[in-house]
Amino acid sequence: GDIDLLVESRKPNEVMDHFLAWEHTDHSIVRGDTKTSIRGPHGIQVDMRVVEKKSFGAAWQYFTGSKEHNVRLRSRAKKLGLSINEYGVTELNQTDGKILAGKSEKDVYKAVGLDWIPPELREDRGEFELSENGELPKLITLTDICGDLHMHTTATDGEATLAEMAAAAVDRGLSYIAITDHSKRVT
């Protein structure tokens, strides 16, 4: 796996210079005008893309959608006489470079007649039809979580005591927790 970073800046060269100077950089793989890739700790590839504010939403949408979702979104745009890429929504075959939408993800989806589709649903598995009909499901949020059924304390390999974990659970509004420390080996 790799790590992808998306950064908004009017000064991409300064951002990339700073990124390349990161003390954990093993070596640079590639550097372009808006994208830099490095080999970081433990051999992990880290890719960074820098875009302007007017394109951040389009880039965020592009990089958080599956390939299938993005192909379908571009196909929909094309039928409407539009083009979508990581820089924004433009009129198809335009030459002036005017971006119609791109600052926010909601603007990108609105430009093609859709409600915003959350990243978790961007798989081309029915989300377009649901969005067209205003029927996208409500996703689970932190307030929906009632408890935690897998927790380890300092008695084994956890980082907090039982009392600390219980207090943290109360602070977070949890109704229950289950301590699942490892059993001591029986010989």
Set out the residue ranges of the language-model regions.
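An N-terminally biased module of ancient metal coordination in phosphate/nucleic-acid-related enzymes
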Residues: D4-L6, R10-K11, E127-T187
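Acidic, metal-coordinating catalytic segment for phosphate/diphosphate chemistry
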Residues: K11-T141
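A short, glycine/Asx- and small/polar-enriched loop/turn
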Residues: G1-D2, H42
